[in-house]
Amino acid sequence: MPYLVLPALIPDIRPCYDAYFAAFSTDPSGSILLDILFPSGVTSDEFRKAHTNGTLQWWHTSETQYTYKCVDSETGEIIGMALCDVFVKPRTEEERKMPEIGWLHGEQRTRAERVLDGLWGARERIMGGRPYVYIHAFAVDPKHQGKGAGSALVQAIVDLGNTIGLPIYLEATPTSENVYFRKGFRRVPAEIAQVVHEAAVLGTKEDVEVPLMVKLPQGVYEVKVDGRKLGEVWAEWQEERKQQQQQQRQEQVQQQQQ
C-alpha cells in the first residue's frame, strides 16, 4: 500500500506521538530511553495531555525543528513520524548548548544527563556548528512495521538533504540501523566519535554502543569532520564496508566448504 509523508499539523500531534510511544515501547533500546526520560511512564492520560500541550508550545517557538507524519493513503491513518532539525546556517556555541532536562530532578536527571551528554558531545564533535539535518526521532507503529512506512519516512528526509545540499546525521539503534544503511547512511568511524552507554546507567547486562550515522547529500564534498573533508571520510567508509562484505563472503564460502 502507498504511504504519504507530509508535514505534521497541530491536530496530528497526538496521533504522531501515539506511533512514537508505541514504537519506542516495543523496541529494546527505545524502551530503555523512555524509561530514562520519562520514568513515571508514558501511557497515562495525564502524561499524554501534558506532553501534547508541551509539544504544541514548542512548535510555537522552535525555528529549526520539523515534524513529518507518515500516512496510510488507503485509510488516512497516521502510522509513523519523524522529527528533524534543519540547520540551514552555521550556529554559535551558545546556540548549540544542550537544553536542560527540566522535567526531571535529582538522580533521575543525573541519569538522563549521563545518557544525553554523550550523544550531544559526539554530535558536536562530528557536525559542530556546520549546517546539516539532524534526525532527532523516527518511529513507525509496530502494527505497520516492515511494510515500507519506515523506508518512506527516511527517503523523504534523504530527499530533503539532497534538495538543500546538507548532510544528515542521526543516532540509530541496533534495530533501526539497517533501515538507514539501505538508504545510504554509514556509521561514523570510532576514531572520529563513539558513544557507548554503560550498563550500570542503562540498567542492562552489557554496555550498549550507539550507531552514529551520516548520509552525504549528492554533490557535497566540502563539509569537514575534525578538519577532514567529509567526502574523504565517506570514501573511507565505503572502502571499509566493501572490505567487510568481502570478508563476510569469504567466511560464508569457508563455512560452506567445511
How would you describe each model-predicted region?
Residues 31-32, 46, 57-64, 75-145, ...:
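Conserved acyl-donor/pantetheine-binding loop and adjacent beta-alpha core of acyl/acetyltransferases
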Residues 28-54:
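Conserved GNAT-fold acetyl-CoA-binding loop/helix
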Residues 137-140, 146-159:
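Conserved acetyl-CoA-binding loop-helix of GNAT-fold acetyltransferases
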Residues 151, 163-165, 174-197:
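Conserved active-site alpha-helix within GNAT-family acetyltransferase domains
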Residues 123-129, 152-168:
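Conserved acyl-CoA
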Residues 135, 168-172:
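Conserved hydrophobic beta-strand within the GNAT/NAT acetyltransferase core sheet
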Residues 66-69:
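Hydrophobic beta-strand residues of extracellular immunoglobulin-like
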Residues 4-30:
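A short beta-loop-alpha structural element at the N-terminal edge
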